[in-house]
Amino acid sequence: MISPDDQFGRMMVENLEQRGCELLGIHAHPTLEAQKKRMEDLLVAKEGQQAKAESLTMCDIYQSKLDGEGERTRIEKLELFDEFEEWALLQSHYCLTLGALLQSADSPIKDLAI
């Protein structure tokens, strides 16, 4: 989870704590950039390697990455979704962070991206 200090984030954290699910490290890495740096720091590169990480909110992934062959359009046709703004707000508080150790600048995944 990210953005625990905005109004919606505080409400989410409080609701989880009331259910006994305290997010112990949430304030140590509260932003996309902090999550990306955390991943890069965890990936200990050896000589000749490069740590690469990328982080996106789930809302960003839905809006910009889930377009292959009309997948987003197909999903949206399955059920009328009248609460998109609330859903987008919720999804903007979750992220996916991907990291890899690249062997060289010529690595086939040198342009690592989500």
Q: Can you describe what each PLM-predicted range is?
A:
Residues M1-I114:
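Alpha-helical subdomain
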